[in-house]
Amino acid sequence: QGRPSFCNLPAETGPCKASFRQYYYNSKSGGCQQFIYGGCRGNQNRFDTTQQCQGVCV
């Protein structure tokens, strides 16, 4: 598979309390899904749009 390894990481909200709508690649379903990002830390499996997510991970 040609997708980056970070695409297999789980969605990670992080410890901060903000509420940003972001998208992550769900390796179980094989598609991009929305999640709420807290604004800090987290991991690389986080995108501003579903199109960005699909472009990198699908």
Curated annotation (Swiss-Prot):
| Transmembrane regions | none
Q: Does the keyword Transcription regulation apply?
A: no
Q: Which residues carry this modification: Pyrrolidone carboxylic acid?
A: Q1
Q: Where in the cell is it found?
A: Secreted
User: Which molecular function GO terms apply here?
Assistant: serine-type endopeptidase inhibitor activity
Keywords assigned by UniProt?
Disulfide bond, Protease inhibitor, Pyrrolidone carboxylic acid, Secreted, Serine protease inhibitor
Stretch forming the signal peptide? none
Feature type site, description Reactive bond: K17, A18
Q: Which domain of life is it from?
A: Eukaryota
**In this UniProt entry, which cysteines form S-S bonds?**
C7-C57, C16-C40, C32-C53
Which stretches make up the BPTI/Kunitz inhibitor domain? 7-57
Q: Does Disulfide bond show up as a keyword for this record?
A: yes
Give the GO cellular component terms, alphabetically: extracellular space
Explain the purpose of this protein. Answer: This is one of several isoinhibitors of broad specificity that are secreted into the mucus of the snail.
| Protein name (record) | Isoinhibitor K
Q: Which organism is it from?
A: Helix pomatia
